[in-house]
Structures are given as C-alpha cells and as structure tokens.
C-alpha cells in the first residue's frame, strides 16, 4: 500500500469480507462477476491450460501471456477492438501477465471458520475478548461443545452428550429418533450454536467500549483490595489483573484501527495470486508445485462437500454435517498454520506441508529471506573489532568504506572550494588519493553521523548512530560498551554501516539514536552499556595484582625470601631481592612503570591522605618496625602507618598495585568530567 506521503509500506491485519471481495471481483462486459474460486483443479491434463474457475483460472487471475486470452486472441495496439478490455468469448482481460503476481481470488466458505492465528496464538485474541477459557473455545470450534443461544435462556457452554446421558437418560429411547427428523435441523439452528458460527455471533454482539469500561472498573477493584496474605489468592489476582490489562489494550487497538472483532472469523478465504504459488514443469514430465496449492485444493474439496450436504440438509444427518464443518475448519487451519493442531500435516511421501505461516516466518521466510537484509545505496559492511581509544559515541570507519560512503559529499566540497573544476577531475583526485581528499573527508565526517546495524535487529538498540572517525585497516572499530545493545562480540561478527542523507534523518540520528543517548534498556530500564567480555577480562587482569599476601613467611623451604623474584635461566633458578617500594604519589608510580622498575601487578605502597576512619580503627598491626631515630612503621593487612618518636602519625600508605592505580584514575577522571558537564547544564 502507499500512504499519503507516497511511501510504499506493508501492513498486515484483519480486513472485512467486503474488502476481500473488492480485491478479487471483476465484472465482465456481460455482467458476470468473477473472482470466486470454486474448483480444486489447476491445469487441464491434455491442453495444459488453466481450468475455468480453478486455482489458476485466467478469468480470475489474468492471462498467462501478456494481452493474450485463453482463446489465443491478442489485442494489439491500434486494433479495432482496442477499447475492449475483455475477450468476448472466454472473458479473460487483455492486460499484462504481471497481474498474476498481485491479483487475488477468494473461496466462499460454506460455514464460518476461525482464523487460527487469532484463536490459538499466544495470547489468544478471541479468548481475551470473549473472556472465555481457550480450551472451551477450541471445543466449541471443533464441535466438541455446543452453545445454547440466548433464546434458550442458558448462555453457557454445555456438553450435549453429557446432558442427554446424565440428565435425560430416562428419555433416551424417545429422544434418539428426534435427531434424524427434519425438525431437529430447525431446532438446532434456532436453539443451539456450534462451530465458528457461535464464535462469530458472540464477537458480533460485543461492545468494545463497554469492555473497556468494565475491565477498567474490575482492575481498579482488584487494585484496591491489596494483598490478602494468601499466596494462591494473590497469584490469581495478579494473573487476572494482567489479563484485564491485555483485554483493555486489545479492545483499544480494535477501536483505534476500526476493525470489527467478528472479522477474526472468516467467511471468505483469500486465495493468493498464482505467481506466488507456482507450478513448474521440468524435463521428463516432472511437475513441481507449491504446497500451498495442495492445501487450497483440500479446502475447496471439503468446502464443496459441505455445501453439497447443506443443500440436502433434509437427508444429511446432523452429525455428518458437523463432522464436515470440522474438516473444513481443520483444512483452513492447515493452510494457515500446519502445526497448529499439534503434529504438522504430511503428504503421501511423509513430507510436511509448508503452510502460509511457514512461508512467512523464520530465517528462510518471505520477509527475512526476500525482503529484508538487502543491499541498499550508501551502505557498507565489514567485520567489527574493538576500538579501545574511541569514545562511547564514536566508531572507526576504514578509509576504503568512508571514501565510498561520503564520495558525493567530498566531490561537492572539492568543487565548492575550487580544488577541482568538474566531477570527472574530482573523481580522479579521489582515485589517486591526494592529500586534500583526506582533509575534506575528515571535515565532512565531522558533521555527519552514520548508522551501525547488526542483524538480526530484534529491538531498537540493534541500530544506533555514531560519529565516524578514520582508522587504518579494513575493519570497523567499535567501543566495547555498546556491544550488549547489538548483542555483538569480536569473534568475527559483521555490521552494516548506513549513511543518513536527509536533514530529518540526521537530526533523528543525533537526537534519538546516538549511542550515548541509549544507556538504558528500553524493555526493563536496566543499564545496557556495561562492561562485558573483553572489558571484564581486561579489568580483571588490570586489578588482579600479585596473589602474594602480606602475611607470607619470611623464608620458604629453600631458605629464600618470598619477596624475591625467580629467574629461570639455563635451568638454574636465581633469586633477587624484590622490595615493595613506597611512592609519594600516583605520578611517581606511573613514572617508575614507564622506566620498567615495576610491573602492573607489582605490590607497592602508595602514600594516601590522612583518613580519620583509618586512624580510628582498632585493628592489630601485623608487624611493627622501629628505626634508630625513633620512627616506626605499623604494617597492617592493607595499609601502613608511619609515626615519629612522639607517637604522632606522619603519613599513611595503602598497599595496592599499578593496575589499581590506573583503574582508579580513569574512574576519577570520568566522574569529574560528568560533574563538570552536569554543572554546565544547571
């Protein structure tokens, strides 16, 4: 369909029987209306031509050859009969054969049939609107239950067999013959409703606005009751409240879209255009046909049998009619969803029939296989790798991809800045990779966001906007914090990059889709930009430190200090004394690391500000060291206290590693930057 802005779009939903007829019906010059498929046949076995009123009828779906009717006549441009749209003899319209890709037909069902998607889907829309258990509705649809009409003053479900066997067993000998009389048909049509027709009657009687009002009142009453303390009753109340919310949402959707609930029960079954369910003839008289054709044949045969029985309802037993209605319902269910009744339907070769649901859904379905995932203009694709130097809102684009995406913008700026005189020379400069090209490319990229997408796009965080930067190589660089939103990792995953062209698209990308604007999960509200995988491993390695504790023994079994390093050269272990150094600031520690005096996991003592909480601790020191001048050191598990002769604390050192120091500095800088940004906004 095409909306008011001339955008092509696809919409899936319920339609009225009148709309289905409007899609298919055509009026011939003689006044005959064609569009209904009444025969299960496809092609004549002798002439290989489509059968009239069959699944491939040319009168209904259009000619097989463009502007050539079933008789073989053609309408050439400039001919005398150019104004005649239809052949006078066979009734085929003189149009292009491509009409068989979108011209639909329909099957007029002899009895109403429920749409299996709306009956057995989770949640069941029909069960939600009627506020009935799904099992009872299924029993009603498939003839296991019957529904007493309001005229009988018993609008409840009842099992006829149980009713007659238990309550009226004494009158069984006189009631049984009544079922075979013509009067029972009149009684059944007046007093009893069964099958999908009963569902349709109940849906047609619904007032959606009353459902909204009653459900809202009931939900408020349950909310006011609160918790009773009984776990079972509270659970039932919660389930009921969730059901009422779903029911209100469904009723509101039907009202907003102007859809009638009874449209969930089919009276007319649309028939797909023949080009979407083809029959292919191969060499050796082999015929390959779509499974949908076989399923349509089954529906038409069973529907014709039911129509025949209904015409002779005086002679046909009621049980036989109900059984045939059930067969029609099952045939339509198999056409729409072959696995809806449990085990999928199979053909004579034990092969599972591929229904309409199977054709549409899944990775090999019509949408994901044919319509989605195609290449589009101004897009590229490459493997993603980690970009540790990138900001959260940045991504690294390879030079090759960037110059292709922004080529038109670069050409425009080259001509605007009079670096070239025409497009041909500008393309040559780009091909030769002149320095001015890269300068202009960086200038263009600075103000133009790009979109990164990783398939499958299961939620809105599957496509986000980034500020591109040029990187060497042929891979896209990505900040590791945004991987969770894409469900991506760096083991060979690929991502597509798209270029928003219009100003509206660029504004939407900047305001709504930038990665630093999507820090929380839209589903549950939890943070989604959290360290994962590579970042967790890096943080673990950075902060693990040396596992040697401060309480290690002075000497090991070999008579060596535990603080000594072991060098294994020529299988002769040698030990060198490794003293834990004291540093007055983190800058001194980083300088020692750059001079390769310490390692990332080397334990060290870092001077810390005097903290009264530490001083006031009543922890017993592990060791106290006294020096000749009267100063002393109290060594604790995680810190060291230096005091003078007067027992005054001069300084405190904490035991840490360079990895902890680096991690702390990064967090401190991030917090300070956030505080400054927040103060600016205020």
Swiss-Prot record:
One of the protein's GO biological processes: DNA-templated transcription
Record-given protein name: DNA-directed RNA polymerase subunit beta'
Organism: Oryza sativa subsp. indica
GO function terms (MF aspect): DNA binding; DNA-directed RNA polymerase activity; magnesium ion binding; zinc ion binding
Binding, Mg(2+): 489, 491, 493
GO CC annotation: chloroplast; DNA-directed RNA polymerase complex; mitochondrion; plastid
Reactions catalysed: RNA(n) + a ribonucleoside 5'-triphosphate = RNA(n+1) + diphosphate
Cofactor info, note text: Binds 1 Mg(2+) ion per subunit.
Pfam families associated with the record: RNA_pol_Rpb1_1, RNA_pol_Rpb1_2
Cofactor or coenzyme needed: Mg(2+); Zn(2+)
Family designation: Belongs to the RNA polymerase beta' chain family. RpoC1 subfamily.
Subunit record text: In plastids the minimal PEP RNA polymerase catalytic core is composed of four subunits: alpha, beta, beta', and beta''. When a (nuclear-encoded) sigma factor is associated with the core the holoenzyme is formed, which can initiate transcription.
Entry-linked HAMAP family: RNApol_bact_RpoC1 (MF_01323)
Gene assigned in the entry: rpoC1
Subcellular localization, as worded in the UniProt entry: Plastid, Chloroplast
């Amino acid at each position: 369909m095409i909306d008011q802005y001339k955008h092509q779009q696809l919409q899936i939903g319920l339609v009225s029987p009148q709309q289905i007829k409007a899609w298919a019906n055509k009026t011939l010059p003689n006044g005959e209306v064609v569009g209904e498929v009444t025969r299960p046949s496809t092609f004549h076995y002798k002439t290989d031509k489509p059968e009239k009123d069959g699944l491939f009828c040319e009168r209904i779906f259009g000619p097989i050859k463009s502007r050539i009717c079933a008789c073989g006549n053609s309408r050439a441009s400039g001919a005398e009969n150019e104004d005649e749209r239809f052949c006078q003899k066979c009734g085929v319209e003189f149009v292009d054969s491509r009409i068989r890709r979108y011209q639909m037909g329909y099957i007029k069902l002899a009895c109403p049939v429920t749409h299996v998607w709306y009956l057995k889907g989770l949640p069941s829309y029909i069960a939600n609107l009627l506020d009935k258990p799904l099992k009872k509705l299924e029993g009603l649809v498939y003839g296991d239950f019957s529904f007493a009409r309001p005229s009988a003053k018993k609008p409840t479900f009842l099992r006829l067999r149980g009713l007659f066997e238990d309550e009226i067993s004494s009158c069984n000998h006189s009631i049984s013959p009544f079922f075979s009389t013509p009067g029972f048909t009149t009684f059944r049509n007046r007093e009893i409703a069964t099958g999908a027709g009963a569902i349709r009657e109940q849906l047609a009687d619904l007032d959606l606005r009353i459902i909204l009002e009653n459900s809202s009142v009931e939900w408020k009453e349950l909310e006011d009751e609160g918790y009773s303390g009984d776990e079972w009753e509270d659970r039932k109340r919660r389930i009921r409240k969730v059901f009422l919310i779903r029911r209100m949402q469904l009723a509101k959707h039907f009202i907003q879209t102007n859809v009638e609930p009874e449209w969930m029960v089919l009276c007319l079954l649309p028939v797909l255009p023949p080009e979407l369910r083809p029959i292919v003839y191969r060499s050796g008289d082999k015929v390959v046909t779509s499974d949908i054709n076989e399923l349509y044949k089954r529906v038409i045969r069973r529907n014709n049998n039911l129509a025949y029985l209904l015409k002779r309802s005086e002679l046909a037993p009621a049980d036989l009619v109900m059984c045939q209605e059930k067969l029609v319902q099952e045939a339509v269910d198999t056409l729409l969803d072959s696995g809806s009744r449990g085990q999928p339907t199979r053909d004579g070769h034990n092969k599972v029939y591929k229904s309409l649901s199977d054709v549409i859904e899944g990775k090999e379905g019509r949408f994901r296989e044919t319509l989605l995932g195609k290449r589009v203009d101004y897009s590229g694709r490459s493997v993603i790798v980690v970009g540790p130097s990138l900001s959260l809102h940045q991504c690294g684009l390879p030079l090759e991809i960037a110059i292709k995406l922004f080529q038109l913008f670069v050409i425009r700026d080259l001509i605007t800045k009079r670096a070239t005189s025409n497009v041909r020379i500008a393309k040559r400069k780009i091909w030769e990779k002149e320095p001015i090209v890269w300068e202009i490319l960086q200038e263009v990229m600075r103000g133009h966001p790009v979109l990164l997408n990783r398939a499958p796009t299961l939620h809105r965080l599957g496509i986000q906007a980034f500020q591109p930067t040029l990187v060497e190589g042929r891979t896209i660089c990505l900040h590791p914090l945004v991987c969770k939103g894409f469900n991506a990792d760096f083991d060979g995953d690929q991502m597509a990059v798209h270029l928003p062209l219009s100003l509206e698209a660029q504004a939407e990308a900047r305001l709504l889709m930038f990665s630093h604007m999507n820090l929380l999960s839209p589903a549950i509200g939890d943070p989604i930009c959290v360290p994962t995988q590579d970042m967790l491993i890096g943080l673990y390695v950075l902060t693990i430190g040396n596992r040697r504790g401060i309480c290690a023994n002075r000497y090991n079994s070999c008579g060596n200090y535990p603080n000594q390093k072991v060098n294994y050269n020529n299988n002769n272990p040698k030990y060198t004394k490794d003293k834990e150094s004291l540093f007055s600031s983190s800058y001194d520690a980083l300088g020692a690391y750059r001079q390769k005096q310490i390692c990332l996991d080397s334990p060290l003592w870092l001077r810390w500000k005097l903290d009264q909480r530490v001083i006031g601790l009543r922890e017993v020191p592990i060791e106290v060291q006294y020096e000749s001048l009267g100063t002393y050191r109290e060594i604790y598990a995680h810190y060291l206290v230096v005091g003078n002769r007067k027992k005054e604390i001069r300084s405190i050192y904490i035991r840490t590693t360079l990895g902890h120091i680096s991690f702390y500095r990064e967090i401190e800088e991030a917090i300070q930057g956030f505080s400054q940004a927040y103060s600016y906004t205020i």
